């Protein structure tokens, strides 16, 4: 439910009605009919001129038959009491262990219908006939001023699949954009970070309506999938928990048809649409994550990837050109990470963790598409095994037991360590085996690669790896082999 402000905060009869009809549920017996009408007061400006050259954090995807565009969307969104790091002015103001464990999803209205203007970054096929009908929606991560972490990791797969992608700018990043180009972004505004939720609702409904003001007008939009990683994984899980039932199309249908929150430890409640969660070995047991696991059910899958760390390796470069302006100042209240400082905690001989998490992420999206389009249930998987104190149980090589097991840990030539302290646990490392150890385990490079290929083939048959991923995984293993 949504709760009104305490007395003395200016709650008028109009605001009470707004709280019941447009921002929450059942206050004073008013039925839950939340954000269900047309976004009549949403205004769209764009596409902005020359987005590839002028838009910070915008990729050039022309060589892949796609186009990049920016839009400014204005509307009205409630200011609410924050419920997670994703809508707080500072992540340090939140108790994430408590936030992630919440099972009672109340909202507390502070001020209704405050104006906002946000930026949408849109990637879409130039040829409408190649559009899949699917739109991936991701909150842009405040770190670095607004990065699409799933776009960065999986854009090759999205474009090969014909998907459109929309990144919604987080309110915390508006000052950096205005400072970068005041003429272009001077109208960006927000009263409070909690307006993010209204921005996501308006953007989703705008795209799904498909009317002339939509950034995807003329595209036959069928499904919207919300995803995110790390901070924006929290945003995805938070939206699913608090807003999925409250955010509706004019006819009462869902705005979002699926959720894929990744690299966050947050509980996600049962919904009427499919949900897939992913946690790396860095994330599965942090912030109370072990208590926020939920058994698979007909609309839910939970994956934990042994050996993978939170700060994941980038995929190989493709024809997409990274942004000309690749970073803006990170807002205050966000963590400041130093890879160099964390590497000093790694043991002798360790190098950065290079686990190809993007390959498993591709399989998640492929399985979600089959689930939505053909009703094909995704595979189940085991949890990472734990000791009595909640740490990952390790095998004889020092790698985690259980979970989704890629050849990095099932046919290992390195130890994948996720045991640094503090924030450095997000980075992870690997300690390559000596040549002597590799030869003792596998005999020869050829025997090792044959075992990797068999392991990758099993993963593909289990649908935990895409078919094209088999050869890619074998090539990665070949580069790592020390024989």
Show where each model-derived region lies.
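N-terminal secretory signal peptides
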Residues: 1-11, 19-24
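Generic low-complexity segments that are intrinsically disordered, proline-rich and/or Lys/Arg-biased
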Residues: 5-6, 32, 39
């Amino acid at each position: 439910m949504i709760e009104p402000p305490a007395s003395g905060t200016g709650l008028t009869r109009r605001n009470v009605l707004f709280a019941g009809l447009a921002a929450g549920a059942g206050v004073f017996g008013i039925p839950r009919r939340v954000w269900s009408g047309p976004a009549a007061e949403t205004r769209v400006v764009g596409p902005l001129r020359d987005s590839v050259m002028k838009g910070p954090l915008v990729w050039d995807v022309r060589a892949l038959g796609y186009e990049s565009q920016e839009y400014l969307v204005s509307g009205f969104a409630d200011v609410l009491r924050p419920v997670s790091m994703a809508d707080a002015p500072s992540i340090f103001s939140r108790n994430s262990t408590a936030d992630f464990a919440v099972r009672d999803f109340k909202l507390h209205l502070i001020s209704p219908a405050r104006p906002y203007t946000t930026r949408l970054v849109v990637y879409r096929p130039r040829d409408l006939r190649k559009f899949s009908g699917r739109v991936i929606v991701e909150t842009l991560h405040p770190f670095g001023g607004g990065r699409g972490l799933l776009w960065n990791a999986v854009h090759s797969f999205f474009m090969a699949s014909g998907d459109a992608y929309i990144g919604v700018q987080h309110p915390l990043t508006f000052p950096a954009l205005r400072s970068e180009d005041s003429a272009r972004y001077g109208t960006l505004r927000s009263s409070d970070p909690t307006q993010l939720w209204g921005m996501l609702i308006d953007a989703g409904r705008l795209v799904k309506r498909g009317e002339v003001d939509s950034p995807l007008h003329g595209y036959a939009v069928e499904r919207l999938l919300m995803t995110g990683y790390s901070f924006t994984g929290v945003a995805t899980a938070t939206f699913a928990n608090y807003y999925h039932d409250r955010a509706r199309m004019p006819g009462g249908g869902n705005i979002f048809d699926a959720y894929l929150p990744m690299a966050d430890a947050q509980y996600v409640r049962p919904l009427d649409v499919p949900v897939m969660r992913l946690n790396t070995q860095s994330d599965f047991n942090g912030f109370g994550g072990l208590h926020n696991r939920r058994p698979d059910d007909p609309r839910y899958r939970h994956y934990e990837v042994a050996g993978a760390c939170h700060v994941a390796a980038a995929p190989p470069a493709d024809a997409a050109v990274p942004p000309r302006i690749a970073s803006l100042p990170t807002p205050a209240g966000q963590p400041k990470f130093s890879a160099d400082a964390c590497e000093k905690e790694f043991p002798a001989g360790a190098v950065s963790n290079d686990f190809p998490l993007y390959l498993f992420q591709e399989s998640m999206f492929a399985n979600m598409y089959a689930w939505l389009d053909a009703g094909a249930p995704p595979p189940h998987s085991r949890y990472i095994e734990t000791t009595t104190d909640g740490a990952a149980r390790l095998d004889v090589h020092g790698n985690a037991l259980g979970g989704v097991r890629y050849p990095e840990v099932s046919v290992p030539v390195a130890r994948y360590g996720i045991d640094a302290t503090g924030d450095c646990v997000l980075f992870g490392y690997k300690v390559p085996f000596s040549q002597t150890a590799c030869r003792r385990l596998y005999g020869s490079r050829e025997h090792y690669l044959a075992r990797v290929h068999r392991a990758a083939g099993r993963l593909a048959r289990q649908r935990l790896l895409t078919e094209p991923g088999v050869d890619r995984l074998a090539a990665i293993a070949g580069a790592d082999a020390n024989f």
